[in-house]
Every structure is written in C-alpha cells, then in structure tokens.
Amino acid sequence: MEEPRPSKRLRSMAPNQASGGPPPEPGCCVADPEGSVEADGPAQPAQPAKPIAYVKPFRRQPPARPESPPPAERGRRRGGSRRPGRGRGRRAGPRGDAGQRQGAEGLMAPDVHIQLDHHGEPGHQGEPEITETAAFSLSETGPPPGTVQEGPGPDVAQPELGFQEPPAAPGPQAVDWQPVLTLYPCIGFRALGDSAVLQVIQTPQGTYVQGVPVFLTDIAY
C-alpha cells in the first residue's frame, strides 16, 4: 500500500523548518520543484538551429547592343579601287549619249563672223559680200551633228587665216589687186548757213569727225 503524500504546503514548509530558517509568512506559497517539473510535463527535445543558405553573388550585365553596319562609302576609297556602278564614270544608254552630244555641240558650236566686203571699182559700187568663218576643234574628226558641211572633207588641210584677195574683175579693167572697202556707219550734220556737212564715222579704231563739201555729198548720194 502506498503512503499518502503530504500536501504541497506541508512539503514546502518542511525544508524551511529543518534548515532552521524563519517560517514562511502565512499566505505565501512555496513552489515545489518536483511539482513544478511534473506540472510542466516532460522536457521537449532541443529544436535545431535555423538553416543557413549560401547565395552565390551574381553581377547583372546590360544586354549587348547589336552593331550597326558601317555607312556605305561614297566615291573613291583611299588606297583602293573604285566601286563598280558608282563614281563619275560615263553613263551608258541613249540619255547619257544624248547629253554628251549636246555638251559637245555647245562647246564646239561654230563661231560665225559676218564681214561686209565691198569690191569697189572706179565710179561703181559693188554688192556687199558676206563671209562666214567657222571655228572647230582639231580633236573632232567630223562636223558636229545637225550642221551642214560645205567644201572639202575633214581630211583636207584647213586654209590658214590671213588677208583674202578678192577675185579679179573680168575684162580689161582687171588689176592685180583691188583694195577692199569696208562699210562703217556714218551720221551727217549740216550747220545753219554753212555749205559743209559734218560727218561722224565710227570705226573699230575710233570715232572720226570730218567735214565734207555739199557738192561732194550730193554726188555721192
């Protein structure tokens, strides 16, 4: 048979009395270590520590931009050959040939000079003669298109520039050489009460003023 256990109050008082200490005050409760252990229950096992995670450092890099193609080279590159289809080469086709032909015609257009030559005879006025001088480039083998060529072909040597002698007049009045008379514009003025006519003649060498008697001007006109 088991013996009855003393109450918690009696057990708490017993050790104090045995040790000779002062009695506990009334109304004070002393906890029993055994009872506290029984009241708390069995001890729980120790909880493991928190897990440690090892993180590998990662460096973020911006995305690489796509490289743009280099700009197309224009003209002739340094130390290289000219690219095909580019540059200042001669254009092929009818339009390019027509443009070059028009440019050649503009540069090699004939230079026309009109000169009035008067083959004078004593007491007779001849008809003015119109001469045309055409200047062409020596590099051209033929006349430019659209022009009419008169006289010898391109293989014949061109005559040299110089004094041109007029053809001799037919008949007994023919001479070895006849002077060439050139017509210049002339303006005449007659003063009041004067028998002379003041004439102003303009020539390439200058302007001349001379007086001519009235009877000579009447005969001439």
UniProtKB/Swiss-Prot annotation:
**What are the start and end residues of every segment in region (Disordered)?**
1-103, 137-174
Q: Where is the composition biased (Low complexity)?
A: 42-53
Q: Which domain of life is it from?
A: Eukaryota
Q: Where is the composition biased (Basic residues)?
A: 75-93
The molecular function GO annotations come to:
identical protein binding
Locations of Pro residues compositional bias?
63-72
Give all cystine bridges in this chain. Answer: none
Q: Which family does it belong to?
A: Belongs to the PRR20 family.
Name of the protein described by the UniProt record = Proline-rich protein 20D
The gene name on file is PRR20D
